Every structure is written in C-alpha cells, then in structure tokens.
Amino acid sequence: MQSDKDKTFDSWLVKAIGRVQGVGYRDACIRYARAQDITGWVRNRVDGSVELMLQGSKEQLADMCRWLRDGIPAAHVEKLEVSKVPPPSPRLNRFDRLPNL
C-alpha cells in the first residue's frame, strides 16, 4: 500500500554549476537530502557540474535548492538550473549517488 507521501510528490532535475566537484558536494547533498526525507540521486557530470534528481514536496524541494546554493562552504554555486519532471515519474526509495556521467 502506498503512503500519502508516495502519492503526492514533485520531481525536479537540478544542475549545479560552479565549483561543485572535488569539494564534498555530493556527499553533503546525500546527507542533507536523507535528513530532509527527500529521495532521488546525485552524480558528477563531465562538464564539471553536479546533477541531482530530487523528489519530495514542493516545500522540501525549494528548501533543498536554497541549501544547494549556500549550504556547502567549500563549494561556489554560480547557477542552479531547475527543471520540473512531469508525472508520472516513479517515487525513488532513497537518495543515492549514481556513477559519473
């Protein structure tokens, strides 16, 4: 049986551009997302950016995006590109690291 959390959620694809690789950005994202009950994944891109799939309530995802900009002192995020993923996208079980792309 699905919980209410699984029935009503948004999915956002986010690309963090700037000094976001080699500074612990992905590990920090995983810890923060799991603590906030956000599901999805994070991975490095060959262009030097970090890409994330975020799933949760609009409020959770907006908070995560604010944190992505300023929550990691060693990183310098110049830009966040956010795209909403249209339903139906299946709810992921947890927040994980994917291989680089």
From Swiss-Prot:
It holds the Pfam family Acylphosphatase. The keyword Hydrolase applies. The active site is at R26, N44. It catalyses: an acyl phosphate + H2O = a carboxylate + phosphate + H(+). SUPFAM superfamilies: Acylphosphatase/BLUF domain-like (SSF54975). Disulfide bonds: none annotated. Coiled coil: none annotated. Its EC number is 3.6.1.7. It is an enzyme of class 3 (hydrolase). The keyword Cell wall biogenesis/degradation does not apply. InterPro entries: Acylphosphatase (IPR020456), Acylphosphatase-like_dom (IPR001792), Acylphosphatase-like_dom_sf (IPR036046), Acylphosphatase_CS (IPR017968). GO terms for molecular function: acylphosphatase activity. Residues 11-99 form the Acylphosphatase-like domain. Keywords: Hydrolase, Plasmid. Belongs to the acylphosphatase family. This is Acylphosphatase. It comes from Polaromonas naphthalenivorans (strain CJ2). The gene is acyP.
